Amino acid sequence: MEARPPKGPGKQFTFDYENEVHKRDYFIKSPPPQLFFSGTSWKKRLFILSQSRGTGLSLSYYKDHQHRGSIEIDGSSTVEVGINCQEKMQSVQKMFKCHPDEVMSIRTANRDYFLIGHDREKIKDWVSFMTPYCQGVKATHQRAEEKLSLGDRRPVSDPSPFLGLCSIPEGIRLASPRASLPEHLIQKSLQRFRQAHLHQDHDFHSEPTQDTEEEYYLTPRSLEACLELENIAGPNDSGDSIESNSPDQGFKRAESNYVSMRSLRTCLLKESTSASADDNDGQAEFQTESELGPPHQDSGTGSDPCLSPPNSKAQTTDDQKGSASLTVVKLSILLNNIPDESQVETLNVFLSPRDAIDYLALVEAAGQICVARWEGPPRLGCLFYHGDHILAVNDLKPQSLEEVSLFLTRCIQKEKVKLSIGRIPNSEKLHASPCACSLRHQLAESVQRDLPELERTPKRSPAIKKSQKEAAGE
């Protein structure tokens, strides 16, 4: 049963429990996952750990006199000190200036919670108290099963004298599910394995055990990699434009058989926005998350835009060069070579939140949040230039890519969002793939070609006159 705080006012208040109360203390609680990187969303709460009706624990938290929620800790939960995700841990340290040992992670079936304290010993004490309730009888049986399974597969590291060598071939099949190694290699490895086992009748934890074990497992792994590369580089790769004499042919072909997670997410987002997008947007591959390095380009109109092309040198026209993503190195060079910061122009770009989320890709470079790629439809045009960096989103200055995403998500219901852009003078325009600028340029060139020579001469005369005047002035 949850705590029932009193209704009357007062500085001191007590809680009535039917179950036993084990611990109570104040912690800073993490917000929902979508607001994790927002420091103002973390709140200080009073936590009370009590016995639940079952075999687990109930961790209730309160704001002043009000019960705000509870965390059920049972056999399916995990409690540990610190945060496994390095990115999240670094963000928490930056926001709260705390040590990793002052953070407690609680993972349940529905959500992950992170609690920040200011006493390492207190955090360790809480984790030590809750851990047995997370493991319970289920974890005991699981450890026993894992021990038996480990004994069947790896008899070298198990000092049990009852384990024989008859189960070794089965263990090899378990550790190597592909079963693509030749039989003579397996027998050779088994022979070395038996010889090492005979020298370790009384000392099972000596250093030779680790060396033999490492050699036994690493050898099949490297051979399997070679066999897989030979199978991948077979005749099935039709349409691959890489020459057969290329030394990295097998690596490139192996890489082309996989779909990157970024491209897969791009496809899912395209399907969800295809109802409101133009027909030409189907061939454009846009970025939703900033990542280091250039993205994959479409190799042709008949290929799947979600697959990485095997040859990135195809179709290197000027328009495709303009539509490619700007790398972190190129953006850093542009920003570091600005002669005067006062020359950077500040302007506002108004977009719908959905267009900004779907078609705009950002990346961090030289301490700025820069525009790396723009894949908007032709109706929007080419709005950005090389080196454009985000100064504010609806007059809110973001400090990271996560805050930009958070600001855009919060105004998703609004009609327009204002992006304050810093623009480098005389920078090159960043074209999109379905860009209309290239069509206008081609049309102007064709009209210029069709005109007679006499009609084209006056258009070039101003430049000629300018050069003559300069020559006369010299």
From Swiss-Prot:
Residues 238-248 have a biased composition (Polar residues). Residues 449-458 have a biased composition (Basic and acidic residues). SMART domains: PH. Residues 20-135 form the PH domain. Disulfide bonds: none annotated. It comes from the Eukaryota. Residues 232-251, 272-321, 449-474 are annotated as: Disordered. InterPro entries: PH-like_dom_sf (IPR011993), PH_domain (IPR001849), PLEKHS1 (IPR042986). This is Pleckstrin homology domain-containing family S member 1. It comes from Mus musculus.
